[in-house]
Amino acid sequence: PANLVFEHGSSPLATVKNYASVFQDKIFLLYTLGTVFNGVIWLQIDNYIPVHLKESFIASSVFGIHISGAKMLSIMVFINTLIIVCFITTANRLTKEMKIIPQFLLGSIIFDLGMLFTIVFRSFWALFLLAILYTMGELICMPPSQVLRAEMMNENKLGTYSGFLNMAQPLASILAGAMISISATTGAVG
């Protein structure tokens, strides 16, 4: 828009000043920290859950098909993808009357509990149902998280805010990977 004035400077000092302004925005910092921790939980699908399924999953036969830990991981990812693709519009319609913060919190809690119990349970049907549960949480919390992100960013410093928030994913990856090493001493819930 013509009335939008970007306040970004082009010098290295201006870049430091831009990021310093983000550090003064305590609410956005808290949101970014939450994004890091949520990313750590989500990345367990790539990091800890395969290890858990390999070591702890109780192999079973479902409808005559042998299900190993590796197959269970594929089934869980398939369930997640299928539900997201088929029900995102329905979930948005069912939650459109909810206020943004309660919707975000509800979805996050459902997702986090689903993931927590995924690393505790070892049987096919429990993990099958938990994959549905954490996917429902994801469906509920993702739309408001995008709205919150957009509403919290200073319009004149979108690049700085976006760049700062983009650091959340690599930080989450580092922490999620470290949790595999930590889990060797803490056990299944580490």
Positions of predicted regions on the chain:
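Short amphipathic helix-loop junctions that connect adjacent transmembrane helices
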Residues: 47-72
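Helix-to-loop junctions at the C-terminal end of transmembrane segments
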Residues: 86-100
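A membrane-interface helix-boundary motif in multi-pass transporters
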Residues: 182-190
